[in-house]
Every structure is written in C-alpha cells, then in structure tokens.
C-alpha cells in the first residue's frame, strides 16, 4: 500500500468533499458544526477527523473560526467529485439505472474507482465535463 493509498480512505475523501462543498458556499472557513451537520455525525467525531486531516496537510485549521482545504485537500475533493459525477452519468446513461438510485451507488463506488476505469468511463461518455 502506497503512502497515497494510506491517506486516501473513504472517510478522508468524504470529509474533503464535504468541506469543499461547504467552502464553495462562501468565503468563511468551514465550522465543525456545519461539517457535522453536513455529514450527519457529532461535532466530537468531526473534531477528531479534522485533527487527522490537519496532520496529513489536507486542511488548514483557523482557531475559533473553522477549516479550509489546502491545495492537496482540494485536489482530493475534486477528484472524488469527478469520480462521483462520472459514475452517476455512466450508471444512468450506459447502464440504464434509474436516476433516483444513481447518487447512492456513486457514493459507494467513487472511493474505489481506479484511474484506468475512470479514463474508460470518461471515454465511453465522450469525455463529458458537464455534471449530470
């Protein structure tokens, strides 16, 4: 297992994606409570994970204000979001899965999509850059 693989757990990816989404709503750092609400977990659990993300260099902690993704954290978030969107499109368009099911399936599969399969799916979809 590479160092990259040890950092890239589903939890790290989910947190990065959630922080990215909350950051995109405004200029303020993301608070522990906002992140806990977004992920449906307790603020205590969020605090423990934020400490880990900070140690990994994926976030910058601003005391009493919240957190922001670093460039590395943002790269992870954007890659997971791309995986998710490609998978949603592929599941619906190529496999005919109903749209009311594709999001939940993509949530699971986004964490295990290899670079090779990502490229094949993108090619199959015509290298789409539009979110479904």
Locations of regions flagged by a protein language model:
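A short, conserved structural fragment
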Residues: 54-62
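Anionic-ligand-binding alpha/beta catalytic cores of soluble enzymes and soluble regulatory domains
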Residues: 92-132
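Short, hydrophobic-biased segments on the C-terminal half of alpha helices
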Residues: 50-51
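Basic, amphipathic "hinge/linker" alpha-helix immediately C-terminal to the N-terminal HTH DNA-binding motif
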Residues: 65-84
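Residues that mark the N-terminal boundary/hinge immediately upstream of a DNA-recognition element
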Residues: 29-31, 70, 87
